[in-house]
Amino acid sequence: MTVLSIQSSVSFGYVGNSVAIPTLQKLGHDCWYIHTVYFSNHPGHERFSGEFATPKSINKKVQNISEIRGLDNCKAVLSGYLGLLSNAKVVASAVDYVKKLDDSRLYILDPVIGDNGKVFVKKGIRSSIRDILLPRADFVIPNMSELSWLSGQDVNNYSAMIAAACHLLKGGPKVVFVTGRVENLQIANYAISEEGVWRAAGQFINRKFNGTGDFFSALVTGLLLNGYKIDDLLSVATAACELITFETQKKPAKELAVITALQKMEIDEIGVRVEKIA
């Protein structure tokens, strides 16, 4: 199956499309990718350089791919870091085009805004994700901070997290995946839908990792297309994130150990325990 992935790219390291492409390929999918930014490396380093893709350039790429029938078999659109505020409408247009071909096709929204209370996107992007992209999404994958910003609610405990996720469900998505909730010595991911709440957790490593959210979103996209049910998907994606952080922890570099992790990742053999808690 084919995924259209519209998000950031770096020459060095693994964030955005740079991690999504090999992950989706590992799961057996073609990935047609359009970059929203072209950076030397992720901004977690002391310095970086690069350019933002304009709405015109992104739209032209989508148009050209469609003209050569490259989107005929596209089964999902995945979007992440937008770069520019005006790119939200271009992503929305691409989603609308793909769904017009077949309304069963999926849109997975990784609402990249920030983390740990810190916003790292341009002014206005938060509201454009909430108002333009969220209503189109079949699945949305916020971290705890992004869940708070999108819902307009404080998310300072479990009950507040569930309430905020249910608020997002009213806006269109079928499932809200909430990532990265630290609980004791674990880091937990949740799947919340009208059918219930599922929890899966891996070991918490007290270190900053750049790109794990992008990795998780690509896993969710690929596993959905592979027919995984929500609980099994959550189990595998959480286990894969635990694996990649373990492998990265072994190295002094700031970049995710994507190649090593993907080589060791056997989808049919990995998984963590999933609880259905509501």
What are these regions (language model features)?
Residues 30, 197-198, 223-237:
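Phosphate-handling active-site elements
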Residues 215, 219, 223-227, 240-247:
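Solvent-exposed, amphipathic alpha-helical segments
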